[in-house]
A protein has these predicted regions:
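Intrinsic disorder/low-complexity segments
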Residues: 19, 23, 36, 56, ...
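Acidic, low-complexity, intrinsically disordered interaction modules
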Residues: 35-113
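Weak global preference for isoleucine
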Residues: 6, 27-30, 56, 94, ...
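Short intrinsically disordered terminal tails
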Residues: 1-3, 113-120
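Negatively charged, low-complexity tracts enriched in Asp/Glu with abundant Ser/Thr
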Residues: 1-30
């Protein structure tokens, strides 16, 4: 029997996490794929003809969730800052410049993603 790097339980949890962040793949140059016994791969920054510049392997759903959450949040902050004086700021600085309501709205999305993914 070939070695497995991810348990069946974690593989199912990772699949739910990947599905929860489906909207991210539509707006960002990211793809998350199930690599079977190896876990899940986040492929990022596709450049023809070489392919993806960055690949991260996940074998536990919690770290995958946190990584995709940060990616989603950073993308939202980038889009909010684009074309404004905040464009040159770092993500933390952009977040602090947002109205409290917008900050709460963004952070509530994390709760929604966690619920969809079955992460507690």
């Amino acid at each position: 029997m070939k070695e497995k790097y991810i348990t069946d339980d974690e593989r199912e949890k990772c699949r739910k996490v990947a599905d929860a962040f489906a909207e991210l793949y539509e707006i960002e140059n990211i793809l998350v794929v199930d690599a079977g016994r190896y876990g899940f791969f986040k492929l990022q920054y596709y450049r023809p003809p070489q392919g993806f510049e960055d690949a991260i392997t996940f074998t536990d759903s919690r770290s995958m969730f946190e990584n995709l959450w940060e990616e989603w949040l950073d993308t939202q902050l980038f889009l909010l800052a684009k074309g404004t004086p905040m464009a040159g700021m770092g993500y933390n600085e952009i977040f602090r410049c947002l109205p409290k309501e917008k900050q709460e709205e963004l952070m509530n999305r994390k709760v929604g993603f966690a619920k969809t993914a079955g992460i507690e």
